[in-house]
Amino acid sequence: MPSLKDLKNRISSVKNTRKITKAMQMVAAAKLRRAQEAAEDARPYAERFNAVMAGLAASVGQSDTAPKLLAGTGSDQVQLLVVMTAERGLCGGFNANIAKLARQKVLDLQAAGKTVKILTVGKKGRDVLKREFGDLFVGHVDLTEVKRVGYVDAQGIAKDILARFDAGEFDVATIFYSKFQNVVTQIPTAQQIIPAEFDAEGAEATSGVVDYEPSEEAILADLLPRGVATQIFAGLLENGASEQGARMSAMDNATRNAGEMIDKLTIEYNRSRQAVITNELIEIISGAEAL
C-alpha cells in the first residue's frame, strides 16, 4: 500500500500533467480556428479549379496530343505513394490512421504485383512506415522548421514529384492525408494526382461552343502542374486542421482523465490518512487503558 507521501507526490504529479494538457488543448483550439479557416477557404478554389480542368480534360479526352500528366504513361506498374502526416505527435490517432491507410494500400499494390515507392511528408508517418517498408522509401520532406504551411511548400513538393515523373520513376502518384470534417471526425483519404483525375460531374456546363486560345492541350499542359501543387496544398491544409482538431480532442480527453485520476488518488489519500489517524487514536487509547 503506498504511503501518504507517495500518494501526495502522485497527486501533485498528475496535477502538473493536467496543467500541461489543458494548456496544449487551449493552444490547439487557437491553432484549429486558423487552420480550419484556411482549409475551408481553399475548398471553393479547389472545387472551381476541378470544374475548369474537368471541362478541359473532357474535351481533350485520351487523344494522342493529351498532356502526359493527363493521359498517363500507359501503365500503372510503378506506384508512388506520397504520405502526408504531422511532424509532432500527441494528436490521438491522426498520424496512425493515415499511416494505416497507406500501409494497406502498399500491401494491396504488392499483392497485385505492382512496384511501390514511398515519399513521406512529416516525420511521424515516416517513422511508422519506415519500420516495415524502409526499402521502398525514395524521399522525405521535412517541414519541422515551417511554422505555417504555405503554397510555396506545396510547390516544392510538387516540383520534386513532377521531376520524378518526367524522369520516368513512376507511373501513378497518390497522396494520403486526413480530410477535416470537425473536431472529432477526420477522414483518412487517398487521392490520385498523377495521372490527373477530375470529377466529370463537376465539369462546367456551357450553353455554347467554347473556342480555346491557345488549344485545350496547351492550356492543360500549363495548368496540370499547377493542379498537382494545388491538390497537395489542399491536402496539407486539410491535414493541418485535422491535426489540430485531433490534438485538441486528445488533450481534452487527457485533461478529463487526469481530473478523474486526481479524484481517485485524493479519495485514496484521505482514506489512508484517516486510517493512520484511527490507528494512532487506538494506540493512545490502548496506552491509556494499560496505565
UniProtKB/Swiss-Prot annotation:
Q: Record's Pfam families?
A: ATP-synt
**Free-text function comment from the UniProt entry:** Produces ATP from ADP in the presence of a proton gradient across the membrane. The gamma chain is believed to be important in regulating ATPase activity and the flow of protons through the CF(0) complex.
Write down the InterPro entries for this protein, in alphabetical order. ATP_synth_F1_ATPase_gsu, ATP_synth_F1_gsu, ATP_synth_F1_gsu_CS
Q: Where in the cell is it found?
A: Cell inner membrane
PROSITE patterns (alphabetical): ATPASE_GAMMA
Q: Name one GO biological process term.
A: proton motive force-driven plasma membrane ATP synthesis
- Keywords for this protein: ATP synthesis, Cell inner membrane, Cell membrane, CF(1), Hydrogen ion transport, Ion transport, Membrane, Transport
Protein family: Belongs to the ATPase gamma chain family.
What is the species listed in this Swiss-Prot or TrEMBL entry? Answer: Ruegeria sp. (strain TM1040) (Silicibacter sp.)
State one molecular function term (GO).
proton-transporting ATP synthase activity, rotational mechanism
Q: What is this protein called?
A: ATP synthase gamma chain
Per the record, membrane topology reads:
Peripheral membrane protein
Gene3D superfamilies, per the entry: 3.40.1380.10, ATP synthase, gamma subunit, helix hairpin domain
Which GO terms of the cellular component aspect does the record hold? plasma membrane; proton-transporting ATP synthase complex
| Subunit relationships | F-type ATPases have 2 components, CF(1) - the catalytic core - and CF(0) - the membrane proton channel. CF(1) has five subunits: alpha(3), beta(3), gamma(1), delta(1), epsilon(1). CF(0) has three main subunits: a, b and c.
The gene that this protein is the product of is: atpG
What SUPFAM superfamilies does UniProt report for this protein, alphabetically?
A: ATP synthase (F1-ATPase), gamma subunit
